[in-house]
């Protein structure tokens, strides 16, 4: 079977490499704007999430398509770990329960798939992180309204054209772009930032995670400054 030769690193760049450079340059430009434009909102979101966890609450995430993947990704950073070994934190992606999503979608319509779950799972003081690149996803907007009726705090994540959606939320993390993939890249960058801030605040004595490791369960409330508990070996 003939072997394909490796690309010649010294050769003149071809059209695909030029397109790759342009795509990466656009991503870098979008992300570079976040420090100046989004840092205050990211800090505010971290403060809201921190207060929720300290008071024994749960952070919920929702979104559609790529934003559903982002919702699950960010929920896992809390319920698993981000950078340090520590107890898990109560975070739920409303996109994950396929039975609930399909049952509600079938019986009530897709627009209700997140709001209906919040009605049964959410409590006053909880936080909803609602992700919509366009700001027009009706299922996400209804989740925002349900969260507000439950006296939850709402953090919105959207793009440059999501002004109406952003206005519905207590704080909005806006990627300054109208290109969907770039908006999503900004969302993950900002999400990772608030995960970092919350984790550092709750677990300042946490140790960098070296690999898979079981951690003990924690009580429902998390006191600030407490590090992960360890089990001594007999």
Where are these regions (language model features)?
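Glycine-rich phosphate-binding loops that contact phosphosugars or nucleotide phosphates
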Residues: 67, 72-208
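YjeF_N-associated NAD(P)HX repair module
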Residues: 189-234
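A short, well-structured juxtamembrane/interface segment
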Residues: 36-55
């Amino acid at each position: 079977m003939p072997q394909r030769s490796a690309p010649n690193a010294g050769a003149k760049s071809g059209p695909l490499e030029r397109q790759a450079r342009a795509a990466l340059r656009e991503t870098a430009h979008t992300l570079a704007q976040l420090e100046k434009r989004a840092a205050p909102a990211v800090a505010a979101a971290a403060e809201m999430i921190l207060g929720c966890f300290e008071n024994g609450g749960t952070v919920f995430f929702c979104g559609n398509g790529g934003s559903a993947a982002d919702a699950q990704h960010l929920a896992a950073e809390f319920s698993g770990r981000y950078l340090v070994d520590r107890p898990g934190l109560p975070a739920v992606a409303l996109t994950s329960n396929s039975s609930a999503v399909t049952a509600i979608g079938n019986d009530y319509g897709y627009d209700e798939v997140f709001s209906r779950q919040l009605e049964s799972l959410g409590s006053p003081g909880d936080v909803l992180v609602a992700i919509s690149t366009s700001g027009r996803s009706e299922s996400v907007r209804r989740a925002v309204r349900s969260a507000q009726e439950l006296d939850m705090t709402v953090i919105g994540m959207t793009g440059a054209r999501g002004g109406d959606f952003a206005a519905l939320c207590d704080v909005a993390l806006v990627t300054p772009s109208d290109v969907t993939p770039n908006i999503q890249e900004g969302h993950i960058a900002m999400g990772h930032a608030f995960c970092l801030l919350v984790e550092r605040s709750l677990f300042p004595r946490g140790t960098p995670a070296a690999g898979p490791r079981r951690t003990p369960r924690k009580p429902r409330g998390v006191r600030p400054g407490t590090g992960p508990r360890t089990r001594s070996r007999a």
